[in-house]
Amino acid sequence: MKIAMLADVFFPDTVGGAGRVAYHLSRQLCRKGHDVHVLTRNPEGKLSRQQQVEDDLFVYRFKLPAKEGLRFFLSELRNSSTAAKKANQEIGFNLLCSHQSLVASGPLFSRPISRIPFVHFFHSPWHEEYLIKKRNSEGKTPQSAKVIAMFMREMEKRILSKALKIFVLSSYSAGQIAAIHHLPPEKVVKIPAGIELDRFRFPQSGKELLKKELNIALDKTAFFTVRNLVPRMGIETLIEAFKQSNVLRQKGVLLIGGEGLLRKTLQAMVKDYDLEESVKFLGRISENDLPRYYQAADFFVLPTRELEGFGLVILESMACGTPVLATPIGAIPETVGVFDKNLLFEGTSGENIRRKLEDVINRFESYRFDPQVCRKFVEERYSWEKMADAFEKEVMGLLKTAV
């Protein structure tokens, strides 16, 4: 197949789960003998316009303004369409696969691209993500944002309706499609996400030595999280849990990786609550160091408040042998809950999180999991190879039907 992969976010240009899914799926499809051409954003034209990542994996970046707004939106519609048409003239695609609605909207409704068989990956509802971003500290959303969100919702429905198949990573996401867009369930296909098992693995030097290397206290329970620092991730609530607890202050340490618009707010919270000895900000963690932090931690914590369509960090941590404590939000129960329901918080509040983390410290042996068991759970269920196999099987059947 000659596949055009349309993605607003793509690893390593950006961090985050959706970009990694697009990257690893593309990479595995190339290894299966397909030609994959990725069309993605290039804010302010800072990255190379065209790049050959592997023998049959090419990335084409279309220029966009740095700041989001109407100009950004219109530029993406126009420039993604232009890039797709130009690439199609040279290559002749027989499949379009998009991972976000905006990047697909320009190409899909312009000829001759609109005639190419099309499938879509639904990671999360576009309009809900937008509303969460626009919500202020008091929990209120401007009316203008609500109007824009209505438009986004309808635009996404048009994209999903046009798709021959809609791929999701979880039953939770499949349920969102049914509840929000009322599309027939037979259009939706759940396929497993993947994990780089050769990169996310057990520490070679042992956890204690790794803690020393990373300057993590040996006499405290190490809780690690890495997220985009935005409101829906629940990092504020995790910090609140430490504020409420002398046990966590004295016997625990929280390591926060990642960047985002809340970074300064979160740092101010830690300072105001006098938590600087208990809560550490690591900033953006390099790809080389990320597995080391998973390996060194006693537990990974996922305090998500809203919209967790899958959670690749769960697989990454467990592949390193480190169990995950998490809120029961979105698709999280489909991984963490299946492994062990006792690792789920009762809810998303700081009190819910505090009680569980204190219990972990006070009854550490009750939460001790064999690292081999954690890793085996991932090995048996998730790999990028399995994902590519499932995707290939589904779309090859579609293309045969379309001929």
Question: What are these regions, as identified by a protein language model?
Answer:
Residues 98-103, 122:
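Short His-centered aromatic/hydrophobic patch
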Residues 264-285:
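Nucleotide-activated donor-binding/catalytic signature segment of Leloir-type glycosyltransferases, i.e.
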Residues 338-351, 359-365:
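Conserved acidic donor-binding segment of nucleotide-sugar-dependent glycosyltransferases
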Residues 314, 323-326:
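Short hydrophobic beta-strand element within catalytic cores of glycosyltransferases
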Residues 284-285, 292-297:
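Short alpha-helical donor nucleotide-sugar binding micro-motif in glycosyltransferases
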